[in-house]
């Protein structure tokens, strides 16, 4: 007599860029009768396809993917708005008896979707003052200030990401506490299995370099040109995306396209280290090797994690 299949719950496939999260998410959705919910902040933008490594319709293997292509490039990303949209979709899938497969490397977005997080409000006066300072002094100066006020937040936020630096400093001023202190403990609102895809750094760096080369060959520069005509340069969030920021700089004559490509590789490697550090701090993540030697075993091991009771 066979046992009943496990009741649907939320699966979060996390880890650094280029680790193989998207393919694993599709596999799990196909095997479990689930649907993918995007947790990559830059894949939320319409038209940002090549540079974000967004799966093509063919690569999605017939699996519905939610929260892709929902914002214009001029829209400023909001994790609070993402939280609302993601939970709406997760709740609907669970009500239908389907497995929500959250896939992405944006750590705060993943936590916003599955954890008991409430995001502090904004103060227009503080925000305006910090944005003026950002314009005058640049993100590096504000990042240095953040490193003093909240070293953990500074480690998690790229020094070039002025928008996120401003937000962290704003929250610190509003609450009188470090930005990271406003993130509560690991208190999930859903029964969630978190699977981290782990790739050794040398191999991951090779994958990143190869991925950037393929993006250039696939037409990233033309994609950025087209999006620039739609307001990409004015978009506070989208214009900072890896690859897009570097190509925009080249199109503005600030560097060559070859230099932009090399800087995209360097910046992506730095970003991958930050992603890895973020997810390593969460004890609920069950890490599985996504290295080339273990790639064939990864789907089976992930499925076995999901199909048995998981604590933590």
Swiss-Prot record:
Residues that hold ATP according to the record: 15-22
Ligand binding (substrate): 17-22
One GO molecular-function entry: tRNA dimethylallyltransferase activity
One example of a Gene Ontology biological process annotation: tRNA modification
Cross-referenced InterPro entries: Dimethylallyltransferase (IPR039657), IPT (IPR018022), P-loop_NTPase (IPR027417)
Ribosomal protein recorded as keyword: no
Taxonomy, superkingdom: Bacteria
UniProt cross-references to SUPFAM superfamilies, sorted A to Z: P-loop containing nucleoside triphosphate hydrolases
Cofactors demanded by this protein: Mg(2+)
Catalyzed reactions per annotation: adenosine(37) in tRNA + dimethylallyl diphosphate = N(6)-dimethylallyladenosine(37) in tRNA + diphosphate
Region Interaction with substrate tRNA: start-end pairs: 40-43
Keywords: ATP-binding, Magnesium, Nucleotide-binding, Transferase, tRNA processing
Enzyme Commission number: 2.5.1.75
Site description Interaction with substrate tRNA, residues in chain: 106, 127
Family note: Belongs to the IPP transferase family.
Record text on subunit structure and interactions: Monomer.
Function: Catalyzes the transfer of a dimethylallyl group onto the adenine at position 37 in tRNAs that read codons beginning with uridine, leading to the formation of N6-(dimethylallyl)adenosine (i(6)A).
PANTHER family hit by this protein: TRNA DIMETHYLALLYLTRANSFERASE
UniProt name for this protein: tRNA dimethylallyltransferase
Species the sequence originates in: Streptomyces coelicolor (strain ATCC BAA-471 / A3(2) / M145)
